[in-house]
């Protein structure tokens, strides 16, 4: 299967609850960094993984407990209510790489996905972005000093 050299990472989301799945899919799509496909059942996810190779599978522990073992062909991040549930679910996927709490803030969920995809714990600003922030700080400081000078004179 052809994949362009420059593409967005593919995330396969496996969550059976429609509202929860839609919410997580929306969070990931709002980042505009990922291609996201969602499956409600494990069998559907396995079929999707064959035709659409994902870079990461984000899998609800409840789906694994109900549907059994899965060969998704991608590193799996488990959505679980706690460490015990995550440990049990990790035995059901072929390449478990950790877990994230179901009640985690969206920033933590995105950070966990990003960490597995890039190996980096945080996304860092580049030197141009830092330069821009420095220029803005200097301009704002200059404006503040100007306003103080006008108020005094």
PLM features per residue range, with description:
Residues 34-40:
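Short hydrophobic/Thr-rich beta-strand motif most characteristic of the beta2 strand and flanking loop
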């Amino acid at each position: 299967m052809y994949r362009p050299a420059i593409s967005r990472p593919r995330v396969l989301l496996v969550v059976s609850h429609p509202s929860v799945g839609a919410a997580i899919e929306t969070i990931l799509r709002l980042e505009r960094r990922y291609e996201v496909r969602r499956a409600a059942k494990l069998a559907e996810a396995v079929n999707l993984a064959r035709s659409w190779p994902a870079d990461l599978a984000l899998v609800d522990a409840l789906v694994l407990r109900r549907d059994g073992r899965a060969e998704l062909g991608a590193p799996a991040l488990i959505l679980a209510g706690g460490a015990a549930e995550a440990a049990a679910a990790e035995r059901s996927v072929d390449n478990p790489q950790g877990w994230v709490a179901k009640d985690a803030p969206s920033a933590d969920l995105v950070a966990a996905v990003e960490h597995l995809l890039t190996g980096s714990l945080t996304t860092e600003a580049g030197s141009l972005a830092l330069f821009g922030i420095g220029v803005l700080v200097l301009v704002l400081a200059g404006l503040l000093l100007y306003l103080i000078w006008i108020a005094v004179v």
